C-alpha cells in the first residue's frame, strides 16, 4: 500500500484522508499540509482511480478497507481518528463510522468499520447511498459537512439527509461551489462559477477543517 504521510508519527491525533474517485491525495496536498502543521498525523492512502458511476462493488469496498489497513499499519492503536473525505472518500468515511450504504441491488452492503473514528469532515460526500432504512442510525461521530450549491454529482438535497444521523452535524452549503471546488488540483477542464473564488475558499476550508479535527 502506498500512502502520503505527513506530520508527527505515532501521534494521538490522526487524520485519515480519503480522496475522491481519482484516488490521489496529492491533489489535496495544501489541505493536508495545513492539517499536518496543526500537529496532526496525516495518513492519506493512494487508491486506484475509477469512475464512480461505473465502479464495481469490489472497487467501492476497497476504499474503506484500504483506510482501515492504513490505520492498522501506521497509526497508534490508541489514536483518536478523524476522517476527512471528498466525494466517494466521504462515503468511505461514513462507512467506517457506522453508516450502512444500500447497493444498486437494493440491499444493504457489508462494509468495513473502524470504532476509533470520532469525527468526520466531509466534502461533497456521496450521500445518496445512505437513503435506505436505518442507514445512518449507528453514526455517532461528530460531522462537519460541506455541500456545493452548484454540485450536480452529489447534490445538496442528497447530502442534507446526513442530518438524519443521531450524531451532531454541522452542514454548510457553499454558494457557487461545484463538486470539484474542494480540490486543490481539480480535474482538467473544470470550470468554476464566475462568482466563486476557489483559492480563498480552499484556504478557509483548510482552516475550518484543521480547527474541527483539533477541537477539544
Region annotations inferred by a language model:
Residues 27, 55-78, 91, 95:
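Alpha/beta-hydrolase active-site loop
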Residues 2-11:
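Short beta-strand-to-loop junctions in surface cap/lid or active-site-entrance loops
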Residues 81, 85-90, 148:
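Conserved alpha/beta-hydrolase "nucleophile elbow" surrounding the catalytic nucleophile
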Residues 92-96, 104, 131:
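Hydrolases whose catalytic domains are alpha/beta-hydrolase-1, hotdog thioesterase
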Residues 11-12, 17-53, 152-155:
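Short substrate-entry loop that stabilizes the transition state in hydrolases
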Residues 139, 145-147:
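Short beta-strand/loop motif that positions the catalytic acidic residue
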Residues 141, 154-164:
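Short alpha-helix in the alpha/beta-hydrolase fold that links the catalytic acid
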Residues 188-216:
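Catalytic active-site module of serine/aspartate enzymes centered on a nucleophile-bearing elbow/loop
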Amino acid at each position: 500500500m502506498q500512502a502520503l504521510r505527513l506530520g508527527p508519527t505515532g501521534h494521538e491525533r490522526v487524520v485519515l484522508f480519503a480522496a475522491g474517485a481519482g484516488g490521489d491525495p496529492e491533489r489535496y496536498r495544501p489541505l493536508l499540509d495545513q492539517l499536518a502543521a496543526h500537529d496532526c498525523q496525516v495518513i492519506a492512502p493512494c487508491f486506484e482511480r475509477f469512475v464512480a458511476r461505473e465502479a464495481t462493488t469490489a472497487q467501492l469496498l476497497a476504499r474503506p478497507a484500504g483506510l482501515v489497513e492504513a490505520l492498522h499499519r501506521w497509526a497508534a492503536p490508541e489514536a483518536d481518528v478523524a476522517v476527512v473525505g471528498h466525494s466517494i472518500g466521504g462515503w468511505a468515511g461514513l462507512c467506517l463510522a457506522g453508516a450502512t450504504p444500500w447497493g444498486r441491488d437494493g440491499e444493504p452492503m457489508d462494509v468495513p468499520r473502524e470504532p476509533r473514528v470520532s469525527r468526520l469532515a466531509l466534502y461533497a460526500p456521496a450521500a445518496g447511498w445512505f437513503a435506505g432504512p436505518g442507514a445512518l442510525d449507528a453514526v455517532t461521530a461528530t460531522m462537519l459537512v460541506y455541500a456545493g450549491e452548484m454540485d450536480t454529482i452529489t447534490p445538496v438535497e442528497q447530502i442534507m439527509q446526513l442530518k438524519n444521523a443521531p450524531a451532531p452535524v454541522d452542514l454548510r452549503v457553499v454558494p457557487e461551489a461545484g463538486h470539484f471546488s474542494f480540490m486543490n488540483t481539480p480535474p482538467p477542464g473544470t470550470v468554476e462559477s464566475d462568482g466563486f473564488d476557489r483559492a480563498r475558499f480552499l484556504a478557509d476550508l483548510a482552516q475550518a477543517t484543521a480547527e474541527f479535527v483539533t477541537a477539544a
